Amino acid sequence: MAEHHLSRFARDRYLLESLRFAAIQDARRVAAQMDVSAADLYALGLIDEALRTLLQRQAAPAQMTNAASFLDQSLGADPVRATQLTFVSEFPTTSVYRGEVSPVEYLHREEGKGAKEEEKEKHSRALSLRGEIVSLEELLLVNLHNGNPAATTLTPLFDDAPLEETAYEKMIEGLGKYFRDLGIGDQAGESLIDMLRAPARASPHSLAGQLEYIIARWGDVLGADFVTRLLRGLDFVKEEVKRFGVGGPGGETPVPTYFGEPEYERYSPDKEWMPRLVLIAKNTYVWLEQLSRKHQRWIQTLDQIPDEELDILRDRGFTGLWLIGLWERSRASQKIKQRMGQEDAVASAYSLYSYDIANDLGGWEALNNLRSRAWQRGIRLSADMVPNHMGIDSQWVIEHPDWFLSLPYPPYPSYNFNSEDLSDDSRVGIFLEDHYYNHSDASVVFKRVDYQTSDYQTRYIYHGNDGTSFPWNDTAQLDYSKAEVREAVIQTILHVARNFPVIRFDAAMTLAKKHIQRLWFPEPGAGGAIPSRAEHGMTRSEFDAAIPQEFWREVVDRVAAEVPDTLLLAEAFWLLEGYFVRTLGMHRVYNSAFMHMLRDEDNAKYRTAIKNTLEFDPQILKRYVNFMNNPDEKTAVEQFGDGDKYFGVATVLATLPGLPMFGHGQIEGFREKYGMEFRKPKWDELSNEGLIRGHEWKIFPLLHRRYLFADVENFFLYDLFTANGAVDENVFAYSNVHGDQRGLVLYHNRFADTRGWIKTSAAYLDKGSGELRQKSLAEALGLPFEGYVIFKDYVTHLEYIRSCEELWQKGLYVELHAYQHHVFMDWQFVDDERWGKIHFALNGAGVESMSAKWEEMFGVKAEAVEEDVRVKMPRKKAAGKKEERRKKAAVKKPAKNKKPATKSSLAKHSEGAKGKKTAMRKPAGKSNASKGSKAQKTSSTKTKSVKSAKRFQALLGHSRKSIVEGKGLSRDEFWRNVGGGVYEQKQPPSLRVAEKQKRYRRKAQKH
């Protein structure tokens, strides 16, 4: 095999024998001596090898011999031989460099003499060439490297300056002419030398770009094995960029889409309490310190948390308490943070020693006490589980070092481990890489020394890492390619589940199969996420053999079987949210888009995200965890302020389907971001009493009504159409229904004013039919076609009245100022012409009490009676004497002994009521009991009306379905026959009430 001709200077200085490196580690060693990029050095070696292979395949031995003869004839044999002698002297092979062969002897010997027999067969071409022919190839390759702008920093390896006084340049020109005339090249009119220079021309300043060019252009020629090595080289380059140019995730928050590879659906079923869970986070040590200050006594353990604090959480509507940092933490982590200047720090909450409750928090006994008292108040405790890694001095690192990803050598020669031993266990030494302490490097490994072995066995264990930023220097990365590790983690999860009904999995996305491989065992060409891991990659088949199924799917199934009634919550990003709940079966998953997009007022993007989810699978929406801050982000008040925008977004948080999660200090308006290593807050902040009162007025009542908003079966999102027909993407309008209770939420997330109509919902997937459907606002809320509806705004606490007919035909007209929001609940249906007068008088305005407004206008209190609120058939006008009697009855005063309704009876709501709602009827002069047979007739009429209504509803459903499916009744026919106008943005001419009532009745009777 031909040797690489490196400069004598490179051999003297760096003891280098070849540009081809058997392992990336060799390239790192040489690069460390040269103070150049190891990735560039390794990439150039691959480029050199690729060009050499192409040269030898394109130019047969006879052609190279003829090329040498051509140079002898055109330039003269003496100048050519002199140039070759100088070249072999300045760029010697190993045998020439060692003095075993002189340059003259080398030029006249057959290359490869003395090679093993199997090598001879493999490299038969090299054996057929004399040294002078091989040196001609090497001369050409040296020229190509010197002319490569991307290889400038590596010039000492092949600097051709010593050849300036020879015929070197003329020989290169002669070779170009010879191969051009011969027609050897990749394209017509291109010489062989032009072809070999193409990668440098295509990507003059990037060796990685040249590798990509070679793969794309000549991959088939070079063969699959060599292409795999080229892809590994690309991965190595990416790793070096990552190592020396690390940055956070940054960038815009992506909008979730669902058009990738098909994924199976396998949701985990919810228990009844799960959709109604409202979670609040508390950094445990910080919270205990704050409680100590508040109550003026030491509160240091979990059992000392006062009952009144749990009462406060219950009264505010919280049903889950996430305690951050309960587990026994790494002592080495605390030492590192204290050495870095945080003298009062504890260890990170995510660098764990073991899954036992920390002793200084009171241990298991204190937890049991708190858990019992919290459960008495309907509050479930939640804890973290950190499956990706353990602390660098954890029990597992001490007792099971083979469970972690490690190497027997440091991956980079520049790493030194001369700092203090961080281990408290005499059996093992733990050493952090020196450059961590002066921030000059972020090592991907730490050193573990086993003092129990005679040779002090040393491992270099990888730190935990998600590939987005620096390694977590107080953690050790578990090796998930090992089945025993996966089982050990699952057993730990089951242990946590037996003690906490809600588990939050930290950084869960790192353990999805594709990300385990991407980060730690990358396929060729897919590496670069974590420095030094490309050389330890696996093919897809190798990886699937090591990890046959998704780890999280196995976890979900095992927990469901062994510890049911446990809610599993995943912190997952990277557009995996839908996959985690729909396919892997997690009950809930983080939705960071909520915080980022509403904060940045990317309203169109967030509305698109909701619409995409509704069109793909609405069930995903109810499994999101929505939040306004989390422990890794700025506080909520820093991001949203403490005014209208904050309360608008908090209202959306409390009323969207999903799990609302409030941050530590969010309600009090605290601005300090608590680090995971904080023992106590560093700022002495006072609670923002105005913000707390605002929550009590606007937010907490909504948390107590989570059952109304938590699910998606009756959730609909609406567009607000402005006067010019455009959709205002800054308005969030949506409704939900639970039983007989209805809720409509409006929020304008922009510093501006807007107005318009809300009528038709966004499309949603009907999973029964597999079709996309829409509903009108009136249909979604189940409103009757006639009469009026009264509802209450839980933001202003005003009551409003609207015409049901208008809501069906036009929708709801709204005007919204900057960051204004409304939550309309307590919907009641009334049917009396005097309510029409109130509706006309108010002209859309709200009042504190509709009962009071009735009394003001008519001098009597309205009477509330229970009435069936299903869609009612419009009553046909009575004729003759019956009509006269009805009119007289309408103006009579109520009986003196009749108890009038109060405001509370009008505005009340009942979660348990089924099919009943408080409604207003016209006051009657006599009770039904005094009317005798007339009461029976009224009852009979009502029964017939209900039956007619059912027939009409069936007809209406058939007609709408026909419109949606494009068959049966046309839109115009629908308007003429049923008069709903649900799907038409443009309303038809209004019909007189009497005509519509006749048509309703006629159509129902015909049906």
Which residue stretches match the model-derived regions?
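Alpha-amylase-like alpha-glycosidases and glucanotransferases acting on alpha-linked glucans and related
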Residues: M1-I299, A358-S372, Q376-I379, G391-R705, ...
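Aromatic-lined substrate-binding rim segments of carbohydrate-active enzymes
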Residues: E328-I379
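Terminal connector regions
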Residues: W827-D868
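C-terminal beta-strand-rich structural cap/linker in extracellular carbohydrate-active enzymes
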Residues: W808-I838
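Intrinsically disordered, polybasic Lys/Arg-rich low-complexity tracts
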Residues: R875-K961, E965-S970, K986, S990-K1003
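Carbohydrate-binding surface patches
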Residues: A723-L781, M825
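Catalytic domains of carbohydrate-active enzymes, especially glycoside hydrolases
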Residues: I305-S330, K337, H495-R504
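Solvent-exposed beta-strand/loop surfaces of large extracellular or lumenal domains
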Residues: F785-Q809
